[in-house]
């Protein structure tokens, strides 16, 4: 019995490593969407109208974050070992600035889109909730 338990645990560990990171990100995105919708306490009709806009928002934020994420992955070993070159540091800094500017542009644009479905107060709260970090 114990032997079977170890085999099952081992297989689950292997399968969890085989799950593509995009699937994990999608799960994280779904959790964030649920968090925002739950905390806004919207009615069913409003949720039905707002959810697609919220999904688009998270897709655009992910698109803006993707280049920096790829660059950080590329330089991960050098960053962790404290051996980044000056050029790499500059690239990482510039990518962070570009990401933050892109996120600001997306948030500003979607605040306006959110207000087409939600009240101004709800749109403000939605943007605030979208920026919360989930554990």
Regions found by a protein language model. Give the residues of each.
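Charge-rich (acidic/polar
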Residues: 23-135
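Bacterial N-terminal signal peptides
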Residues: 8-18
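Short, low-structural-confidence N-terminal segments
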Residues: 3, 14, 23-25
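Short linear motifs in intrinsically disordered/low-complexity regions
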Residues: 4-5, 17, 91
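Bacterial N-terminal signal peptides that target proteins for export
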Residues: 1-9
């Amino acid at each position: 019995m114990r032997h079977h338990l170890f085999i099952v645990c081992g297989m689950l560990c292997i399968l969890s490593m085989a799950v593509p990171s995009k699937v994990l990100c999608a799960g994280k995105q779904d959790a964030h969407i649920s968090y925002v919708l739950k905390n806004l306490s919207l009615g069913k009709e409003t949720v039905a109208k707002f959810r697609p806009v919220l999904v688009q928002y998270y897709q655009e934020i992910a698109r803006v974050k993707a280049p920096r994420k790829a660059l950080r992955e590329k330089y991960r070993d050098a960053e962790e070992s404290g051996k980044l070159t000056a050029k790499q540091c500059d690239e990482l800094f510039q990518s962070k600035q570009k990401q933050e500017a892109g996120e600001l542009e997306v948030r500003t644009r979607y605040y306006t889109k959110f207000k087409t479905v939600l009240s101004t107060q709800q749109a403000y709260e939605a943007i605030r909730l979208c920026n919360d970090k989930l554990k």
